[in-house]
Amino acid sequence: MIKTYLAIIISCLTGLSLQAQYAYFGNRGTISFDKVTYTKARMRQMSNDMSSKMMDRGMGFMEHLDKMPESHTDRMNLYFDENATVLMPEESTSTEKQNGEGKMRAPNVTANGRGGRNQGGARGGGGGNQRGMLRGGANKNGKVLYQDLKAGTADIQLNIDEKYLLSETLDSITWRFTEEFRNIAGINCRRVNGATKDSLYLIAYYAEEIPVSAGPALSHGLPGMILGLVIPEMHIQYWATNIAYTNNLVPTDWRDKKSKQMKLEEFSALFGRYMPRNRQNESAKKRILEQLVY
């Protein structure tokens, strides 16, 4: 009888140990993100860029700037496992913030890291209807970003005049670690400052509790999942709001077999031809690539 009790106790302790390990170091699951685009600031910058290049359209933007919302928020889901991630929008979940009014779940972070608020959230073992969300609940016309972490490649599926599936190698990002920390979705995250090969400045907050080197908008290269991503130059921010650990692999049924496949660089060159002559340069191509990814 004593041996039986001991066996039960050992079994319970082992189960609790495994459960704790799974809860704190989960490498499969779904992360809900708020993607916040600061519309006015973004349009103001575009107008200034056009004005500096002697383009008449720049002044046209300024006339309508006061009528634009301060920001626009899209809800995104990031599905992840040890080897891959898929980021796609939820259906009908965008919100706008007019003239500084209204609620916004994501904190505001400037390039120097000041301002904003801590992000609360829930963590759990949900996500059992993951594939159903992809087939029925996801925005089928929305952009989908896929990372193959093992192969170091990415696919971007988007719908313009028709559906395209663009392939690209994951570019390295140079990261510089700081001693600043922020709580995002209930997890303590460390801030790092980064730069892409095209010198686009990034601010990221990653969590070692999720040992997957990935994040939203094809971000990667850190010793943990990126739960906060800020692109100051583009006035775009991603903030995790909820994390659900599961046993599911990243789904693959998001791909449309009818999508037109090409390299990302080919796509950039193709659409660059429709831009004004004075914008057919490397800077314009860079802008196109940034718009596709972020």
Question: Can you describe what each PLM-predicted range is?
Answer:
Residues M1-G26, Y294:
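Bacterial Sec-dependent N-terminal signal peptides
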